[in-house]
Curated annotation (Swiss-Prot):
FAD binds at residues 322, 356, 386-389, 404-406, 410, 419-422, 599. Residues 234-448 form the FAD-binding FR-type domain. GO terms for biological process: cysteine biosynthetic process; hydrogen sulfide biosynthetic process; sulfate assimilation. Keywords: Amino-acid biosynthesis, Cysteine biosynthesis, Electron transport, FAD, Flavoprotein, FMN, NADP, Oxidoreductase, Transport. It comes from Shigella dysenteriae serotype 1 (strain Sd197). It is an enzyme of class 1 (oxidoreductase). GO terms for molecular function: flavin adenine dinucleotide binding; FMN binding; sulfite reductase (NADPH) activity. GO terms for cellular component: cytosol. Binds 1 FAD per subunit. Binds 1 FMN per subunit. This is Sulfite reductase [NADPH] flavoprotein alpha-component.
Length: 599
């Protein structure tokens, strides 16, 4: 929109300030501009002169601190909703991302709420690793003056369900904190549990926290609203797929696709480091197979979110069919009295193993039963979008977004099975076909603000994706900082993703160094962590020169092996013992010089 600027003589801003203000508000809608106006009014009224007129100084108010520790955005959304609820109740509240929280100040907190997800094998989200480490260290203070509550989000298909929340809850209590409420562990379908928990938190805090003055509520409540867009997880953009290109060789064991999606004139914005959320539909053939195995027709009416739909449509659009869980196996066994599955009930490890190796449709195939349509629906979990690290920068591709998709395919007793979202993009969306997408912002995986800062990128396999975006951005910015890429995959000839682009960046001098690890091209397997150790001396020089280190890819094995290699390099070339090296790497993480996007 165009904003009419008053004559310069009437402005209290100098030309430079005016230019910065105009640049910051160019893309805002009228609603957003109105919000900004209210925000600055709140800031103005937060000045000492204004505060003098309030009933009590803010310093005397035991404010509420909400710490949001999010990996995919769900925890952040719950935390923001709670913040809004508390502001509506006129309570003094501050919301802070775990990565921005100065954790040494935790001893001075009075009322603390933690909303956290879990990643990998029970680890906290990336932005909360430093806080988690601090609380579990010898440096953790006594917290006898804190009252706290924890809301934990997880996925029951994983063994360490909600482990991060369990960790925070038990440690805060161990350090002397008082539980406001018992911890809540929420599964993938977390919305109802979150809504009920938020109401209980507000009720519990009303009796403990004084009411805030309106001006204070405006200022403290709005600080963390950074990203605004008409499109979201719940209201995705209907975009179109323009390119679906296989970028692994004919003889590769992997099927990796370069996907380009046209955003049209939506003005949907993203930054390198963000993720693309993709809502997919299940394979109609898979739906038909499952329905027929249960002796159903597919046209039976079922209720989904208050709407009546045919069973086939509900299964294709609304329910998760490609990821089994221990809960589903246990419930199916109990419901059908399956002689094969009933012995697994109550055996957590066996249930987890069965769910991990047996898709839902094959569970039904191996243990057939007859269910009615509603019983089937009640057994399943809601379909959730998949997130892919964005592999492009809008500085180069403008109204497009690119992702790098490893297509999941495997056999179960002679039948080919595939991942829900990856096979949707690779096999079922035709050129110019519709794809529902949204941006999941990730401020914990960002290029350095200073373009002169060196960058070290470690991304084997499809973990290369965000570094393609990084390089496009650095090239467009003509950033003078050095760039070093570590990439690995099984074979040079079949699996060198975006090979021509990396070679061009090297030739142009944009990519300063590239180290490649091909795990199957020689007798002894070589991985990126081996290359890190091999280049330890030079790596330490880059770190000493202020380099930022980025890691993307598998959380369970690769990321841990890479971190161990980094610790060894720091210890050897930095002349540190193991404990000092660990402290050094933790400090890099706090300084945002060590960032990971792992999954």
């Amino acid at each position: 929109m165009t904003t009419q600027v008053p004559p310069s003589a009437l402005l209290p801003l100098n030309p430079e300030q005016l230019a910065r203000l105009q640049a910051a508000t160019t893309d805002l809608t009228p609603t957003q501009l109105a919000w900004v106006s209210g925000y600055f009014w709140g800031v103005l009224n937060q000045q000492p002169a204004a505060l003098a007129a309030t009933p009590a100084p803010a310093a005397e108010m035991p404010g509420i601190t909400i710490i949001s520790a999010s990996q995919t955005g769900n925890a952040r959304r719950v935390a923001e909703a709670l913040r809004d609820d508390l502001l509506t109740a006129k309570l003094n509240v501050k919301l802070v991302n775990a990565g921005d929280y100065k954790f040494k100040q935790i001893a001075s907190e009075k009322l603390l709420i933690v909303v956290t997800s879990t990643q990998g094998e029970g680890e906290p989200p990336e932005e909360a690793v430093a806080l988690h480490k601090f609380l579990f260290s010898k440096k953790a203070p006594k917290l006898e003056n804190i009252a706290f509550a924890v809301f934990s989000l997880g996925d029951s298909s994983y063994e360490f369900f909600c482990q991060s929340g369990k960790d925070f809850d038990s440690k805060l209590a161990e350090l002397g904190g008082e539980r406001l409420l018992d911890r809540v562990d929420a599964d993938v379908e977390y919305q109802t549990a979150a809504s009920e928990w938020r109401a209980r938190v507000v009720d519990a805090l009303k009796s403990r926290a004084p009411v805030a003055a309106p001006s204070q509520s405006v200022a403290t409540g709005a600080v963390n609203e950074i990203h605004t867009s008409p499109y979201s997880k719940d209201a995705p953009l209907v975009a179109s797929l323009s390119v679906n290109q296989k970028i692994t060789g004919r003889n590769s064991e992997k099927d990796v696709r370069h996907i380009e999606i046209d955003l049209g004139d939506s003005d949907l914005r993203y930054q390198p480091g963000d993720a693309l959320g993709v809502w997919y539909q299940n394979d109609p053939a898979l739906v038909t197979e499952l329905v027929e195995l249960l002796w159903l027709k597919g046209d039976e009416p079922v209720t989904v979110e208050g709407k009546t739909l045919p069973l086939n449509e509900a299964l294709q659009w609304h329910f998760e069919l490609t990821v089994n869980t221990a809960n589903i196996v246990e419930n199916y066994a109990t419901l059908t009295r399956s002689e094969t599955l009933l012995p697994l009930v109550g055996e957590k490890a066996k249930l987890q193993h069965y769910a991990a190796t047996t898709p839902i449709v094959d569970m039904v195939r191996f243990s057939p039963a007859q269910l009615d349509a509603e019983a089937l629906i009640n057994l399943l979990r809601p379909l959730t979008p998949r997130l892919y690290s964005i592999a492009s920068s809008q500085a180069e591709v403008e109204n497009e977004v690119h992702v790098t998709v490893g297509v999941v395919r495997y056999d179960v007793e002679g039948r080919t099975r595939a991942g829900g979202a990856s096979s949707f993009l690779a096999d079922r969306v035709e050129e110019e076909g519709e794809v529902r997408v949204f941006i999941e912002h990730n401020d914990n995986f960002r290029l350095p603000a200073n373009p002169e800062t060196p960058v070290i990128m470690i991304g084997p396999g499809t973990g290369i994706a965000p570094f393609r975006a990084f390089m496009q951005q650095r090239a467009a910015d003509e950033a003078p900082g050095k760039n070093w890429l570590f990439f690995g995959n099984p074979h040079f000839t079949e699996d060198f993703l975006y090979q021509v682009e990396w070679q061009r960046y090297v030739k142009e001098g944009v990519l300063t160094r590239i180290d490649l690890a091909w795990s199957r091209d020689q007798k002894e397997k070589v991985y990126v962590q081996d290359k890190l150790r091999e280049q330890g001396a030079e790596l330490w020089r880059w770190i000493n020169d202020g380099a930022h280190i980025y890691v993307c890819g598998d959380a369970n094995r690769m990321a841990k092996d890479v971190e161990q290699a980094l610790l060894e390099v720091i210890a050897e070339f930095g002349g540190m013992d193991t404990e000092a090296a660990d402290e050094f790497l933790s400090e890099l993480r706090v300084e945002r010089r060590y960032q990971r996007d792992v999954y």
